């Protein structure tokens, strides 16, 4: 037997197609939203850490009347930059309070085992906070121990306004070579 029908075709809306298109648009919108929120969160993290860091090279002057070493930082110098901290007369001034990783290496010029007989017995490199004077403290004291190079690093809390100074025993001369003499800081935790 045949079924009887009205014989009249009722136009159907393509609900399935409309529903698929709506879900696809919703999914694309959610992906774009998540991507933009992720970008904003990443940028906020970068801004909150401040990326305070510096890698400095020696600003060498021929005669050393002062034991203090002067530093310079600029991309024009090569592998040298300052982002966050500031250079103040060759010394590094901290702009944000936090825990910093300090690293330093100094190599002496014209240094060999035969020159140690005329070198000072207590040839040292000192890295410390020299300003403000109420907060002045030595952070690293490195003895050359009859070698031509010293290097060290450490984590230390620093406050906004601290000025880091490096002193080298007179009359020793540090190497100008950027691979041999450098100093840097990096904020690791605000």
From Swiss-Prot:
<keyword id="KW-0472">Membrane</keyword>
<dbReference type="InterPro" id="IPR042374">
    <property type="entry name" value="CD70"/>
</dbReference>
<dbReference type="GO" id="GO:0048018">
    <property type="term" value="F:receptor ligand activity"/>
</dbReference>
<keyword id="KW-1003">Cell membrane</keyword>
<dbReference type="InterPro" id="IPR008983">
    <property type="entry name" value="Tumour_necrosis_fac-like_dom"/>
</dbReference>
<feature type="domain" description="THD">
    <location>
        <begin position="52"/>
        <end position="188"/>
    </location>
</feature>
<feature type="glycosylation site" description="N-linked (GlcNAc...) asparagine">
    <location>
        <position position="110"/>
    </location>
</feature>
<keyword id="KW-0812">Transmembrane</keyword>
<keyword id="KW-1015">Disulfide bond</keyword>
<feature type="glycosylation site" description="N-linked (GlcNAc...) asparagine">
    <location>
        <position position="59"/>
    </location>
</feature>
<dbReference type="GO" id="GO:0042110">
    <property type="term" value="P:T cell activation"/>
</dbReference>
<dbReference type="GO" id="GO:0160162">
    <property type="term" value="P:CD27 signaling pathway"/>
</dbReference>
<feature type="disulfide bond">
    <location>
        <begin position="111"/>
        <end position="148"/>
    </location>
</feature>
<dbReference type="InterPro" id="IPR006052">
    <property type="entry name" value="TNF_dom"/>
</dbReference>
<feature type="topological domain" description="Cytoplasmic">
    <location>
        <begin position="1"/>
        <end position="17"/>
    </location>
</feature>
<keyword id="KW-0325">Glycoprotein</keyword>
<comment type="similarity">
    <text>Belongs to the tumor necrosis factor family.</text>
</comment>
<dbReference type="Pfam" id="PF00229">
    <property type="entry name" value="TNF"/>
</dbReference>
<dbReference type="GO" id="GO:0090717">
    <property type="term" value="P:adaptive immune memory response involving T cells and B cells"/>
</dbReference>
<feature type="topological domain" description="Extracellular">
    <location>
        <begin position="39"/>
        <end position="190"/>
    </location>
</feature>
<feature type="disulfide bond">
    <location>
        <begin position="130"/>
        <end position="165"/>
    </location>
</feature>
<comment type="subunit">
    <text>Homotrimer.</text>
</comment>
<keyword id="KW-0735">Signal-anchor</keyword>
<dbReference type="GO" id="GO:0005164">
    <property type="term" value="F:tumor necrosis factor receptor binding"/>
</dbReference>
<protein>
    <recommendedName>
        <fullName>CD70 antigen</fullName>
    </recommendedName>
</protein>
<keyword id="KW-1133">Transmembrane helix</keyword>
<comment type="function">
    <text>Expressed at the plasma membrane of B cells, it is the ligand of the CD27 receptor which is specifically expressed at the surface of T cells. The CD70-CD27 signaling pathway mediates antigen-specific T cell activation and expansion which in turn provides immune surveillance of B cells.</text>
</comment>
<dbReference type="GO" id="GO:0033209">
    <property type="term" value="P:tumor necrosis factor-mediated signaling pathway"/>
</dbReference>
<feature type="glycosylation site" description="N-linked (GlcNAc...) asparagine">
    <location>
        <position position="167"/>
    </location>
</feature>
<dbReference type="GO" id="GO:0005886">
    <property type="term" value="C:plasma membrane"/>
</dbReference>
<feature type="transmembrane region" description="Helical">
    <location>
        <begin position="18"/>
        <end position="38"/>
    </location>
</feature>
């Amino acid at each position: 037997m045949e079924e009887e029908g009205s014989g009249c075709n009722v136009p159907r809306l393509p609900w399935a197609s409309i529903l698929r298109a709506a879900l696809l648009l919703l999914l694309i919108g959610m992906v774009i939203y998540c991507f933009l929120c992720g970008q904003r969160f990443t940028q906020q993290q970068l801004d909150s850490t401040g990326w305070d860091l510096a890698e400095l090279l020696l600003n060498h002057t021929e005669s050393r009347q002062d034991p203090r070493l002067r530093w310079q930082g600029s991309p024009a110098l090569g592998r040298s930059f300052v982002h966050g901290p500031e250079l103040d007369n060759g010394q590094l001034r901290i702009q944000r309070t936090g825990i910093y990783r300090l690293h330093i290496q100094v190599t002496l010029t014209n240094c060999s085992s035969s020159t140690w007989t005329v070198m000072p017995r207590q040839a040292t490199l000192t890295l410390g906070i020299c300003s403000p004077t109420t907060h002045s403290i030595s952070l690293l004291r490195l003895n050359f121990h009859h070698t031509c190079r010293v290097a060290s690093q450490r984590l230390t809390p620093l406050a906004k306004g601290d000025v880091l100074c490096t002193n080298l025993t007179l009359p020793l001369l540090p190497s100008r070579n950027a691979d041999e003499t450098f100093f840097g800081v990096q904020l690791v935790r605000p």
